């Protein structure tokens, strides 16, 4: 299944949760979910009772859409998490957080992961001094992630940094906003990652 590219606000309303897909509108309280916190359609305000399988599937969809990845990529990450020692769900979240597009977003250089992905694919991002244009590139602890020199005054990047100054930066990155670079200092603990996803249902789904 390909990565979702449809109307993001309708998707958020269908799933009933903000997926950080419309950063600036969400921060301003102007997203469709803020205005109409129910599913789209004639009967949207009457949410149907969801089965256990439906709940498991919904949590997987939320994670895929939030991080902007395909079913194939998601399954591959889950399989890697399952092979490692430790809590599979927490390890899955950790692997998702290590994606370069997500790290660019977490450092505040983009208001959404979708825009962060564009910055990466269009060659605006360096990792440890080398240009990397692969959104799924895994950022290791201690890595330096920065905006290339000619893009440091990009209005969208500057605007994103201004907006994230209001919301704050996560604790596992150190960012020099003026110089447009950051250090991915460590992998986050699961409780630090504030996302509307219950990954235990994803583990149950893939463990069948």
Curated annotation (Swiss-Prot):
Part of the 30S ribosomal subunit. Contacts protein S5. The interaction surface between S4 and S5 is involved in control of translational fidelity. One of the primary rRNA binding proteins, it binds directly to 16S rRNA where it nucleates assembly of the body of the 30S subunit. Residues 98-161 form the S4 RNA-binding domain. Keywords: Ribonucleoprotein, Ribosomal protein, RNA-binding, rRNA-binding. It holds the Pfam family S4. The keyword Acyltransferase does not apply. InterPro entries: Ribosomal_uS4, Ribosomal_uS4_bac-type, Ribosomal_uS4_CS, Ribosomal_uS4_N, S4_RNA-bd, S4_RNA-bd_sf. One of its GO terms (biological process) is ribosomal small subunit biogenesis. The keyword rRNA-binding applies. This is Small ribosomal subunit protein uS4. Belongs to the universal ribosomal protein uS4 family. It comes from the Bacteria. GO terms for cellular component: small ribosomal subunit. GO terms for molecular function: rRNA binding; structural constituent of ribosome.
């Amino acid at each position: 299944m390909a990565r979702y590219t449809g109307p993001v606000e309708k998707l958020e309303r269908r799933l009933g949760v903000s997926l950080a897909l419309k950063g600036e509108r969400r921060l301003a309280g102007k997203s469709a979910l803020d205005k109409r916190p129910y599913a789209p359609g004639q009967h949207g305000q009457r949410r149907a009772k969801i089965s256990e399988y439906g709940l498991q599937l919904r949590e997987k969809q939320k994670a895929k859409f939030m991080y902007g990845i395909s079913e194939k990529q998601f399954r591959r990450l889950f399989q890697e998490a399952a092979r490692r020692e430790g809590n599979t769900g927490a390890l899955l979240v950790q692997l998702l957080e290590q994606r370069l597009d997500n790290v660019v977003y977490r450092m505040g250089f983009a208001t959404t992961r979708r825009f962060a992905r564009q910055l990466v694919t269009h060659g605006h991002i360096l990792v440890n001094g080398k240009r990397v244009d692969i959104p799924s590139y895994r950022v290791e602890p201690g890595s330096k992630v920065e905006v290339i020199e000619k893009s440091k005054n990009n209005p969208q990047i500057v605007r994103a940094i201004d907006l994230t100054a209001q919301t704050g930066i996560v604790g596992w990155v150190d960012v020099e906003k003026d110089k447009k670079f950051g250090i991915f200092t460590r992998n986050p603990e699961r409780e630090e990652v504030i996302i509307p996803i219950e990954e235990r249902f994803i583990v149950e789904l893939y463990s069948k």
